[in-house]
């Protein structure tokens, strides 16, 4: 098989009211889907990002990722240790890495992220890169809000963004979560 067409392994993560698809290659997590979206969301993303790749359902291969995401949803995990395989431009990678630096339970604005990557005039491009983040939750784009503190767009939808931010605020105030 060609190296540019990796096999994508996928699973449906179900925890309480949370249901979303996750996918990985042998190198790491590549996709965390939106809350309660059909599998077509994953298939459409895979066709664009990894055209011609084989998609294989494999709960066992996805178990390490599912465990950490579930721990996060339980309020028992602040940081992720599973590998993530980023597939994006250098600019997108810079933005996604900056997102991973936002502390658990805190938020930043799009202009904060633009400043963090030394591109203060690139606020709109930062927004586009955040919108292209394929790995929700583990690359915490839900922690980015408007400069005035308002909730802004999120691939998973406003309800999912609100739930994630509330989860982090609640978990941060209730206990000191181990890393």
Swiss-Prot record:
Keyword Transferase applies: yes
Catalytic activity, as annotated: a 6-O-methyl-2'-deoxyguanosine in DNA + L-cysteinyl-[protein] = S-methyl-L-cysteinyl-[protein] + a 2'-deoxyguanosine in DNA; a 4-O-methyl-thymidine in DNA + L-cysteinyl-[protein] = a thymidine in DNA + S-methyl-L-cysteinyl-[protein]
Active-site residue list: 141 (nucleophile)
Class of enzymatic activity (EC top level): transferase
Alphabetical UniProt keywords: DNA damage, DNA repair, Methyltransferase, Transferase
Protein EC: 2.1.1.63
A family per Pfam: Methyltransf_1N
Miscellaneous note of the record: This enzyme catalyzes only one turnover and therefore is not strictly catalytic. According to one definition, an enzyme is a biocatalyst that acts repeatedly and over many reaction cycles.
Protein name: Methylated-DNA--protein-cysteine methyltransferase, inducible
Gene source species: Bacillus subtilis (strain 168)
């Amino acid at each position: 098989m060609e190296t540019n067409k990796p096999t994508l392994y996928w699973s449906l993560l179900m925890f309480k009211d949370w249901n979303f698809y996750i996918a990985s290659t042998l190198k790491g997590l590549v996709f965390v889907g939106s809350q309660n979206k059909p599998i077509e969301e994953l298939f459409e993303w895979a066709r664009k990002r990894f055209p011609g790749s084989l998609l294989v359902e494999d709960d066992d291969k996805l178990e390490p990722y599912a465990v950490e995401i579930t721990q996060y949803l339980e309020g028992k995990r602040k940081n992720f240790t599973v590998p993530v395989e980023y597939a994006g431009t250098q600019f997108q990678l810079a933005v996604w890495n900056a997102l991973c630096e936002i502390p658990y339970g805190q938020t930043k604005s799009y202009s904060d992220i633009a400043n963090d990557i030394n591109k203060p005039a690139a606020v709109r491009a930062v927004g586009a890169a955040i919108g292209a983040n394929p790995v929700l939750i583990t690359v915490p784009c839900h922690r980015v809000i408007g400069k005035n503190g308002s909730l802004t767009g999120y691939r998973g939808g406003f309800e999912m963004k609100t739930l994630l931010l509330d989860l982090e605020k609640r978990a941060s105030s209730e206990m000191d979560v181990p890393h």
